[in-house]
């Protein structure tokens, strides 16, 4: 009874398909050359979801920001980016059959951004700002920085006398 249960469990766990025994190198090559699944099966765009679409305008803006020239085939780049976005969203979904976007995906959209223009630019650091920061700098004992003056060093000084022989 144990052996039947074990073999049944093993068959269910290891694979839902049964393969014939592959004995030669040629049979293995032929088997691996056949496509048994496609990533498009996993990456079906859910209908009615609020998934952001990558538009050709976004592709042109990203190319401009990266310093690359405009591509002749923007359609393929747009399609590739849309597939990548679907794949990333698929990674954040626990249930593969969901139609509505998951809360994890929504949290992710708030953290990761594609375009630099979505971020607030910082004010450039100038020399006067650096000098002001240096003047306001104080030693921090938690970092092991100790405040001392030159008189503290002179007080604990020592002298080495050499004898001539």
From Swiss-Prot:
Gene Ontology terms for molecular function: ATP binding; glutaminyl-tRNA synthase (glutamine-hydrolyzing) activity
Top EC class for this record: ligase
Gene Ontology CC: one annotated term: mitochondrial inner membrane
Locations listed in the record: Mitochondrion inner membrane
Taxonomy, superkingdom: Eukaryota
The keyword ATP-binding is annotated on this UniProt entry: yes
Example GO BP: glutaminyl-tRNAGln biosynthesis via transamidation
UniProt cross-references to Pfam families, sorted A to Z: GatF
Predominant location category: mitochondrion
Keyword Transit peptide: yes
Catalytic reactions of this protein: L-glutamyl-tRNA(Gln) + L-glutamine + ATP + H2O = L-glutaminyl-tRNA(Gln) + L-glutamate + ADP + phosphate + H(+)
Membrane topology designation: Peripheral membrane protein
EC number: 6.3.5.-
Keywords (A to Z) from UniProt: ATP-binding, Ligase, Membrane, Mitochondrion, Mitochondrion inner membrane, Nucleotide-binding, Protein biosynthesis, Transit peptide
Subunit description: Subunit of the heterotrimeric GatFAB amidotransferase (AdT) complex, composed of A, B and F subunits.
Function comment: Allows the formation of correctly charged Gln-tRNA(Gln) through the transamidation of misacylated Glu-tRNA(Gln) in the mitochondria. The reaction takes place in the presence of glutamine and ATP through an activated gamma-phospho-Glu-tRNA(Gln). Required for proper protein synthesis within the mitochondrion.
Protein name per UniProt: Glutamyl-tRNA(Gln) amidotransferase subunit F, mitochondrial
UniProt source species: Candida albicans (strain WO-1)
């Amino acid at each position: 009874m144990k052996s039947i249960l074990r073999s049944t469990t093993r068959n269910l766990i290891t694979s839902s398909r049964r393969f014939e025994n592959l004995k030669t190198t040629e049979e293995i090559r032929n088997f691996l050359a056949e496509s048994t699944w496609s990533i498009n099966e996993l990456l079906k765009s859910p209908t009615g979801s609020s998934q952001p679409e990558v538009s050709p305008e976004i592709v042109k803006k990203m190319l401009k920001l990266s310093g690359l020239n405009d591509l002749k085939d923007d359609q393929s780049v747009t399609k590739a980016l849309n597939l990548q976005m679907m794949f990333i969203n698929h990674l954040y979904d626990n249930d593969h059959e969901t139609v509505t976007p998951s809360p994890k995906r929504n949290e992710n959209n708030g953290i990761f951004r594609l375009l630099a223009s979505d971020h607030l630019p910082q004010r450039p650091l100038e020399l006067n700002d650096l000098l002001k920061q240096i003047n306001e700098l104080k030693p921090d004992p938690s970092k092991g920085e100790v405040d001392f003056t030159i008189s503290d060093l002179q007080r604990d000084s020592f002298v080495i006398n050499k004898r001539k022989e």
